[in-house]
């Protein structure tokens, strides 16, 4: 059996919310894939004026993405740097904490329960694109190839960059750790170079966690939100295969002008991005999109 269904699953699950500062919609759709491996967080007011959104795109299974969805908020809020308002450092440390939890027996037990198996080591992983809004400051921590961008004065302002094995910096780390890059893939397998999980690439005790073949180290980008920022859009890589950021921005703008309904906007966007068939391979992935509209 190949990776695709004979017909796409186009049913969508959407959650919405709003407060005095923004409203949001988070939508996911399985699409052509045999399984749904995405997970996400949409959590307003984890504290007064602090909000958390995240996209986790799983590979090799859904269990690591689901684990991150379950635990990221709690681990972030327990972090001492978070409590001291050192948010950049707190986000980075939480990525590594989740990765460490995955390696512990209790973490493996939970992964096995998610998968419905016993006594196996999970080889799955996931991207993590995490947005923390604190007042008027936006922090985005990213590991992998899920993305976030702002609509800033009608133009996309990227809040993350993809981590790919053939990028010079990534390739050097992979090779220093004893790995190799072939056909744009780490060890000829993974098409991204940073992720949560993927524990088989993180076993060498000679190297720090950030030095392993696959690293959980996120890039963290920070910006101050102003009146020129209309919305934040986050998504797994399946959202960005068909259209570029400007095309997505224009489509969302047009939908919001006509309906002011975020759920309609995100659901129609995924319909537009879904491939008609699987012949080209693009537009065939699971899709998760979070739209945060600032008031």
UniProtKB/Swiss-Prot annotation:
Entry-linked CDD domains: PP2Cc
EC number: 3.1.3.16
Name of the protein described by the UniProt record: Probable protein phosphatase 2C 5
BP terms from Gene Ontology: signal transduction
Ranges annotated as spanning the membrane: none
Domain of life (superkingdom): Eukaryota
Keyword Transport attached: no
Functional note: Enzyme with a broad specificity.
Chain residues that bind Mn(2+) 1: 57-58
GO CC terms: membrane
